[in-house]
């Protein structure tokens, strides 16, 4: 068996597709009308159609349960954050935070209240610590990454 992708349910395909394309820079792989797959490896599916497929009432499909997130990485997190600041429609779970392992991330909601996390790649985190003068060993401890990974990032 092969896992293909996560699929999230959306109320308005046009609004959600615009969010993923314009806010998160995702590219559409396939547009099948009620289902849109993105090259990033996830899909959105129209709620009314999904409810019919699984045989439930639309109202039985939860909105914003806060029990999962889609995770993205952005090489230039600061530029992304600056771009977000100009978008009044973006609703935040929280602003940028530094996780205990040193990674900076922001969480926001998509139009259907799915949680979206955008963080910097761990390679960037490691390089930032090394640039601050941390040793390979200190960086590995601080980031919880193996020393070999830290050396490869140097």
Which residues make up each language-model segment?
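Major-groove recognition helix of helix-turn-helix-like DNA-binding domains
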Residues: 147-154
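Conserved beta-strand-loop-alpha-helix junction that forms the acyl-donor binding cleft
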Residues: 10-13, 100
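Vicinal oxygen chelate
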Residues: 1-5, 26-75, 81-109, 121-132, ...
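Conserved active-site tyrosine of GNAT-family acetyltransferases
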Residues: 16-21, 84, 113
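Helix N-cap motif at beta-to-alpha junctions
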Residues: 12-13, 75-77
């Amino acid at each position: 068996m092969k896992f293909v992708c996560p699929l999230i349910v959306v109320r308005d395909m046009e609004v959600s597709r615009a969010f993923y394309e314009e806010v998160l820079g995702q590219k559409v792989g396939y547009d099948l009308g009620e289902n849109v797959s993105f090259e990033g490896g996830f899909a959105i599916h129209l709620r009314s159609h999904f409810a019919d497929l699984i045989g439930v009432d639309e109202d039985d499909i939860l909105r914003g349960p806060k029990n999962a997130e889609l995770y993205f990485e952005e090489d230039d997190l600061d530029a992304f954050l600056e771009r977000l600041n100009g978008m009044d429609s973006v609703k935040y779970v929280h602003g940028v935070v530094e996780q205990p392992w040193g990674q900076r991330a922001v969480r926001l909601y998509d139009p259907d209240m799915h949680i979206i996390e955008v963080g910097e790649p761990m390679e960037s985190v490691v390089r930032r610590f090394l640039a601050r003068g941390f040793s390979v060993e200190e960086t590995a401890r601080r980031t919880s990454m193996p020393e070999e990974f830290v050396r490869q990032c140097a």
